Amino acid sequence: MSDYRRFIAYLYEYPNNRKGGCCGFVRVESQNGFCRMDFQIKSPSLPPETSVTVYGFIRRSGRMYGIPLGNLLAGRSSTSGKLFTHSDAIGQTDVTLDELGGLILLCRQTGVIATQWDDLPIQPEFFAPTLTQEPKTSAENGTRPTEEKT
């Protein structure tokens, strides 16, 4: 049980790239090399049946680079779902859970929902949805992240 880690991070809307109100939370659990993220979102700005793309992000050179983790499907009054990945190979990259700065959720119609756990402010205008790979020793030992829609 020594590798067990669990925390909750609150999700905020970022209308016009400014932090708005709290709209939900994500519970992140890591154990035995696997990471599970449980999302609960209540945002009237998310239209039903809208796809929400979830990215983990890391910070490099003043920018935030995304690692695609999966998609959630917005419900009528709320959005909930689970995403799974390896704790030491987030989104099949060489990035670990400990290196992530937080999560950014993008919805084409409504914009950005985000959380951070590295204690640095989120600036959506500096987000790039793809991580540029730097030369680093890595092993592709993960499986593709899966999702569960509820």
Regions found by a protein language model. Give the residues of each.
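N-terminal targeting/export leaders
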Residues: 1-150
